[in-house]
Structures are given as structure tokens and as C-alpha cells.
């Protein structure tokens, strides 16, 4: 497995702390409100326990969830950092493809303009509600149980996430088998007409979610 390009690994002292040290670190990031602090805490919020005393992770997540939910200025700053992370859907409903790099011309970066905008929006709503779930689908379910998402929203958002991750995973598996670079770009022309329609609908659902989050965190409806 390739090492994390951002050096977000246990061999980096920044990401190797005791529970009490993590609480102090999150408190510091929460008071700074700058780009680096928000980006690092954004990564931290999705942590999951994989080894050792699971209760340590549970207690830490509960404590951090309460800290962030009470920090409205920080939540607003978090939204500001992700405000321009839009989906790959144009004003008239067509796909917005990557035309900057010749290698990916006509393709969609399904992570940066698909799953990422959704993950960020769901994470932000979950942090505001002090939800301790880390996985996106689990967060959607928790938001539904709290009454933040209705039944239709729960179903459509979960379906949209599963569709995007499914398309992306299929492409990555195919590229790996063919010895190609495994990345996040997908050519919509390689999808069936039905898949293209479903992808368009999924991106529209995510775009609507982001508009809602923008309205709730900035009171701006445009």
C-alpha cells in the first residue's frame, strides 16, 4: 500500500497522541479557525478504532463531539473551507468534466466532485448534532433518527452515496486489472444510458444537500 501523501500516519508524531493530548489538540484547532487547523481536524473527525482499548476511542469521540457541537464559530469556519467544493453538474444538468489535464479530458473526478462534497456536508451536519458515527452511511442514518433528515432524504442520500462509490470502485478495479493508474476519474461516456441518468440524479441530490447546508450554516439561500 502506498504511504499517505499528506503524511497522516501513526509514524507522524502529530497523529500519535494520548486521549488527553487529542482533547487539547482539538481544543487548539477549534480556537484557531484557520485553514490548516480545519483541514487537520477534518481528517481527525473520521477516525475509527482498529486496535487496542475501544473504550478509549469511544470516550474520546464523545468528548470531541460535544466540544465541536458547542463551537458554532468553528462549524461556520469549517463550512467556509468547503463552500466551493461543488459537484460535477452544470447549471443545465450536464456533466462538468475535467478539461485541465489532457490525460483526463472529458472525465469526471468522482471523488473531488462527487463523493467528497457529500461526505463533507454529511460530516458537518453530524458534527453540529454531536453525532459520534464516523462512516457516512451511519451518519446519514443517525441524522435521520435525530429528525434532521426525513425518510426520503435518508433513502435518496444513501442510494446516491452507494451509486457513486460503486461506479468509482468498479472503475478502480478495472484499471488495476489492466495495469493502469488507479485514481478517481471516470469517463461518463463509458457508462450506460441508465447509469448516466442515475449518476445525474445522484449528483443533483448531493447538490441539493449542499445548498441546504449552505443555507443552515450561513443563512444564505443563493
Question: What is each residue range found by the language model?
Answer:
Residues 1-222:
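A nucleotide- and high-energy phosphate-metabolite-utilizing enzyme signature
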